[in-house]
């Protein structure tokens, strides 16, 4: 390998020898791409070695990597950019780009703790875990620190541990099967589904106290929001959300109301495409549905061709597009990143403008009205769906009958608008009044509902939760 660096120290060569490689790239241009990857990895390792030599932690890093031992000590670097990169405290937030990263050509550290090596950005523990352990790693949501790591990323200390063997991959929890009684009665018509599309939803801001780029969501919801008539809507919430908190709905604590019924276990299975995304401008569907197969993907406003990890809205045409929609599309920018990791879905705002999310599952978690729209500012992320919470609600709803289960269909649909919000606090009061928005259908939970509804007894007119 012809290095772009004038000299590669022996310790860097040794550490690069332990680098984990992804599957063979193959195809035209694979050699050039691999060469660029090798050069980037060399830069990342050389930069880290340079920093660790100053603190005497280099030997511990080499020991951890060569022995692959989690009982090694923490290998830390400062978590503030001014300490590690010598940047002046005069650097303001306005000087950082849309991901919170200052643009230096070699290696920089952002205000939110992200690291940039040769124009490629990421959190330092993610970069080095990807390099030495998991080449397919996408996000910090996929990692959790081992118990004896004193400087884990989640602890938000002045220093952060980059020892790749102090982190583990988050495993997707196995959802318990739902015991479904086979009912003999056949419904003559499908029960009405609660629809909040044309109602005026309440609004809430991103939960207070959550730091940007943090995967921590406080258990205590924000104070009760204000309804249209100016009164707090806590009473309305209590009436609407009478299913209790997710912690109270563990499937293991629920039992069928009639033990004499024929009970059949209905299991959850992961589909090939975990979600489907449709793009709308006002009330008009635009373009084809995007089917997500990768655990991490972005929906942005650029004109690059879409691929399995990227849904670009910039190329989509609409003859009915007006000036407001056109202007909004210009401000989508880097859009939103969606993660599906460990049975949880996260939305991270990458745009310079906020995104607005209506997630009944998230609203259930915080005790908000099911139709509440949450504003997510730039640089922040929010958990918008949790499979285990949904499984608990499904297990409880089965005991309440076909209609209660069917009502869970709306929990599997998430609406998200770019730049412009909607709801009681906005001029636009329905999602179809916003210039640019997307609708996510979570295929795994929807297909699980289908199987449960079929087991419970399908209506005479065939209609499923996917219809």
From Swiss-Prot:
Region (Disordered) location: 207-251
Residues binding Zn(2+), per UniProt: 74, 149, 161, 166
Span(s) of short sequence motif PY-motif: 221-225
Species for this entry: Rattus norvegicus
SMART domains listed in its UniProt record: DWA, DWB
InterPro entries named among the record's database cross-references: Dwarfin, MAD_homology1_Dwarfin-type, MAD_homology_MH1, SMAD-like_dom_sf, SMAD_dom_Dwarfin-type, SMAD_FHA_dom_sf, SMAD_MH1_sf
Its biological purpose: Receptor-regulated SMAD (R-SMAD) that is an intracellular signal transducer and transcriptional modulator activated by TGF-beta (transforming growth factor) and activin type 1 receptor kinases. Binds the TRE element in the promoter region of many genes that are regulated by TGF-beta and, on formation of the SMAD2/SMAD4 complex, activates transcription. Promotes TGFB1-mediated transcription of odontoblastic differentiation genes in dental papilla cells. Positively regulates PDPK1 kinase activity by stimulating its dissociation from the 14-3-3 protein YWHAQ which acts as a negative regulator.
Modified residues (Phosphothreonine): 8, 220
One cellular component (GO) term of this entry: SMAD protein complex
MF terms (GO), sorted A to Z: chromatin binding; co-SMAD binding; disordered domain specific binding; DNA binding; DNA-binding transcription activator activity, RNA polymerase II-specific; DNA-binding transcription factor activity; DNA-binding transcription factor activity, RNA polymerase II-specific; DNA-binding transcription factor binding
Residues that span the membrane, as ranges: none
Post-translational modification summary for this protein: In response to TGF-beta, phosphorylated on the C-terminal SXS motif by TGF-beta and activin type 1 receptor kinases, phosphorylation declines progressively in a KMT5A-dependent manner. Phosphorylation in this motif is required for interaction with a number of proteins including SMURF2, SNON and SMAD4 in response to TGF-beta. Dephosphorylated in this motif by PPM1A leading to disruption of the SMAD2/3-SMAD4 complex, nuclear export and termination of the TGF-beta signaling. In response to decorin, the naturally occurring inhibitor of TGF-beta signaling, phosphorylated on Ser-240 by CaMK2.
Main localization of the protein described in the UniProt heading: cytoplasm
Annotated CDD domains: MH2_SMAD_2_3
Subunit and partners: Monomer; in the absence of TGF-beta. Heterodimer; in the presence of TGF-beta. Forms a heterodimer with co-SMAD, SMAD4, in the nucleus to form the transactivation complex SMAD2/SMAD4. Found in a complex with SMAD3 and TRIM33 upon addition of TGF-beta. Identified in a complex that contains at least ZNF451, SMAD2, SMAD3 and SMAD4. Interacts (via the MH2 domain) with ZFYVE9; may form trimers with the SMAD4 co-SMAD. Interacts with TAZ/WWRT1. Interacts with FOXH1. Interacts with SNW1. Interacts with CREB-binding protein (CBP) and EP300. Interacts with SNON. Interacts with ALK4/ACVR1B.
Protein name (Swiss-Prot/TrEMBL): Mothers against decapentaplegic homolog 2
Expression sites by tissue: Expressed in cardiomyocytes.
Transcription regulation is among the record's keywords: yes
Entry keyword set: Acetylation, Cytoplasm, DNA-binding, Metal-binding, Nucleus, Phosphoprotein, Transcription, Transcription regulation, Ubl conjugation, Zinc
Modification N6-acetyllysine occurs at: 19
Residues where Phosphoserine is found: 240, 245, 250, 255, 458, 460, 464-465, 467
UniProt feature, compositional bias: Polar residues: 207-217, 233-243
């Amino acid at each position: 390998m012809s290095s772009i660096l004038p000299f590669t120290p022996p310790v860097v060569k040794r550490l690069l020898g332990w680098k984990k490689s992804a599957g063979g790239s193959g195809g035209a241009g694979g050699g050039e791409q691999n060469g660029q990857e090798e050069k980037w990895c060399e830069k990342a390792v050389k930069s880290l070695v340079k920093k660790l030599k100053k603190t005497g932690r280099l030997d511990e890093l080499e020991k951890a990597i060569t022995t692959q031992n989690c009982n090694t000590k923490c290998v830390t670097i400062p978590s503030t950019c001014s300490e590690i990169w010598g940047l002046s405290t005069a650097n303001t937030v306005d000087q950082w780009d849309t991901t919170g990263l200052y643009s230096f050509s070699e290696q920089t550290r952002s205000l939110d703790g992200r690291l940039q090596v040769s124009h490629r950005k990421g959190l330092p523990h993610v970069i080095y875990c990807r390099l030495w352990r998991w080449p397919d790693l996408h996000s910090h949501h996929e990692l959790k620190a081992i118990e004896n790591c004193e400087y884990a990323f989640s602890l938000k200390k002045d220093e952060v541990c980059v020892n790749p063997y102090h982190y583990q991959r988050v495993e997707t929890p196995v959802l318990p099967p739902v015991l479904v009684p086979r009912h003999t009665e056949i419904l003559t018509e499908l029960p009405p589904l609660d629809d909040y599309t044309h109602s005026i939803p309440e609004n809430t801001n991103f939960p207070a106290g959550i730091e940007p780029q943090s995967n921590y969501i406080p258990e205590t919801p924000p104070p009760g929001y204000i309804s249209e008539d100016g009164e707090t809507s806590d009473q309305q919430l209590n009436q609407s959300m009478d299913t209790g908190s997710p912690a109270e709905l563990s499937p293991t604590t629920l039992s069928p109301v009639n033990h004499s019924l024929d009970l059949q276990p209905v299991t959850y299975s992961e589909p090939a495409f975990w979600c489907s995304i449709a793009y709308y401008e006002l009330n008009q569907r635009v373009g084809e549905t995007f089917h997500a197969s990768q655990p991490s993907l972005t929906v942005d406003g650029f004109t690059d061709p879409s691929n399995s990890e990227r849904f670009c809205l910039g190329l989509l045409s609409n003859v009915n597009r007006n000036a407001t929609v056109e202007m909004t599309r210009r401000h989508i920018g880097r859009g939103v990143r969606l993660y599906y990791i460990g049975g949880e879905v996260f939305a991270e705002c990458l745009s310079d403008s906020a995104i607005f999310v209506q997630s009944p599952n998230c609203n259930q978690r915080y005790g908000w009205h099911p139709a509440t729209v949450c504003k997510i500012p730039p640089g922040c992320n929010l958990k918008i769906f949790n499979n285990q919470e949904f499984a608990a609600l499904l297990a409880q709803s089965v005991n309440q009958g076909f209609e209660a289960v069917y009502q869970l269909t709306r929990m599997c649909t998430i609406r998200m608008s770019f730049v412009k919000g909607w709801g009681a606090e906005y001029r636009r009061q329905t999602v179809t009044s916003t210039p640019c928005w997307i609708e996510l259908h979570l295929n795994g939970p929807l297909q699980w509902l289908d199987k449960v509804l079929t087991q419970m007894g399908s209506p005479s007119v065939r209609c499923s939760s996917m219809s």
